[in-house]
Amino acid sequence: MHTTRLKRVGGSVMLTVPPALLNALSLGTDNEVGMVIDNGRLIVEPYRRPQYSLAELLAQCDPNAEISAEEREWLDAPATGQEEI
């Protein structure tokens, strides 16, 4: 088990993570992690944003849904750049 000490940095408390643990989780600075308390334990784990395929995203859409006034305005607006429609 690795141990570390909580340190005050400005108005926050910092938890330093030993390099061996970062390497084991393929983490580095500026990576996002999730934190949760479970039975009195702080659990920190890598946060990976879900990756969806186009098919998965389209499966969530209702092709019969009504178009809102805002969407209709956007669809009817003239091209403003080099769009090809």
Curated annotation (Swiss-Prot):
InterPro entries (UniProt xref): Antitox_PemI-like, SpoVT-AbrB_dom, SpoVT-AbrB_sf
GO MF terms, alphabetically ordered: DNA binding; toxin sequestering activity
SUPFAM superfamilies from the UniProt entry: AbrB/MazE/MraZ-like
Keywords on record: DNA-binding, Plasmid, Toxin-antitoxin system
Pfam families: MazE_antitoxin (PF04014)
Recorded superkingdom: Bacteria
Residue ranges of every copy of the SpoVT-AbrB domain listed in the record: 4-49
Disulfide bonds: none
Protein role: Antitoxin component of a type II toxin-antitoxin (TA) system. Labile antitoxin that binds to its cognate PemK endoribonuclease toxin and neutralizes its activity. Responsible for the stable maintenance of the plasmid during cell division. Both PemI and PemK proteins bind to the promoter region of the pem operon to autoregulate their synthesis.
Classification via PANTHER family: ANTITOXIN CHPS-RELATED (PTHR40516:SF1)
Quaternary state and interactors: Forms a complex with cognate toxin PemK.
Assigned protein family: Belongs to the PemI family.
Protein name: Antitoxin PemI
